[in-house]
């Protein structure tokens, strides 16, 4: 992913974050650090769970594609994050399931005097069939 300038952030312009396919090992390692529930870290517990197998922690898909897709494009423009809202987990994400992500600025409020802008980013993550698995909004203060 190439670095993009703040000027390229336009309301309703969608940016592709790429695709992530998590392995069972990815799910277990992430969960051990961030969400150590049995059905994320123990094979037998995962198979006996509601999900009948390993599923990613709710935050893992966002964190993965944010790190590999969004930060390389826009990280250099960030002053700080301000809010995270409306995080919805619609479908479980299993190991070996490819998930694609996009980020779309849904609101941009520039302050020329202070040389910053508040941007509300809408994130969508979909499975290979195009079904939403997760959505959220993140409000970020950007340098302009």
Please give the residue ranges for each predicted region.
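HotDog/MaoC-like acyl-thioester-processing domains
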Residues: 1-11, 89-144
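Hot-dog-fold acyl-thioester-processing enzymes
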Residues: 1-83
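Generic beta-strand hydrophobic packing signal
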Residues: 85-87
